[in-house]
Regions:
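DEDD superfamily 3′-5′ metal-dependent exonuclease/proofreading module
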Residues: 1-28, 34-41, 66-223
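Short, surface-exposed acidic-centric catalytic microdomains
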Residues: 41-61, 65
Length: 223
């Protein structure tokens, strides 16, 4: 990957889904927010996932099975358009912004095994966790937005989350200018390394607590 991360040319992506397991989740809403200079183009698509949306998921994003069935596009159509837009963004030279990329991108891979990461990804979750290792508190998008004074209205609405993630990415580059000095390849490798190290530490913590939970060490798509 050539070039560097340009915060003025981003494609920010977020999914709301039927569940927390990326291997089984179906898309409910998909948002892609294209930012180029002062121009912004928002696309949010509602999908009919073809299955019941669990009440726990509806409680998070507010979309019920009935609403998705009545108003949503066919699931495979939303999936295909999402992947097409991401690939187009990379072809146009944009960096893909995904907060906690290992969830959203792993969902795409599980739903379409042909999906691959062919362009640069910037994950504010991973970067913030590395650059502010000792900050206490949760690393949810809401908490990180509060730390960087980024407004987040309608949390867990895909488009709102995508916009907020892009704003956090921009704030990170202002606070840590070395992020835009790295080449795209260097930034991808750095994030992969930071994620791996963080997950190894998390696994060690689980073991210390006597818990048998296993964690994923791969970024930006879980193995």
């Amino acid at each position: 990957m050539n070039g560097h991360f340009d915060p003025s040319h981003m494609l920010s992506f977020d999914l709301e889904t039927t569940g927390v397991d990326p291997q089984t989740a179906k898309i409910v809403t998909s948002a892609l927010v294209s930012i180029r200079g002062k121009e912004r183009d928002d696309l949010e698509m509602l999908a009919d996932p073809g299955i019941e949306i669990p009440k726990q998921a509806s409680a998070v994003h507010g979309i019920t099975t009935e609403y998705a069935r009545e108003h949503g596009k066919p699931h495979d159509e939303v999936l295909a358009e999402t992947i097409r837009r991401i690939r187009q963004g990379w072809d146009d030279g944009a960096t893909l912004i995904v907060y906690n990329a290992t969830y959203d991108l792993s969902v795409l891979r599980a739903l379409d095994p042909s999906f691959t990461v062919d362009g640069p990804v910037f994950d504010p979750f991973v970067v913030d966790k590395e650059k502010n290792k000792f900050r206490k508190g949760k690393r949810t998008l809401e908490n990180v937005c509060a730390h960087y004074n980024v407004p987040l209205d309608n949390a867990h609405e895909a488009a709102a989350d995508a916009v907020a993630a892009a704003r956090v990415a921009w704030k990170l580059t202002r606070e840590f200018p070395e992020l835009v000095e790295m080449t795209s390849d260097e930034l991808m490798l750095a994030q992969s390394t930071w994620y791996y190290q963080s997950q190894v530490e998390l696994q060690a913590w689980f073991e210390k607590q006597g818990k048998s939970a296993s964690v994923n060490n791969n970024w930006p798509i879980a193995s």
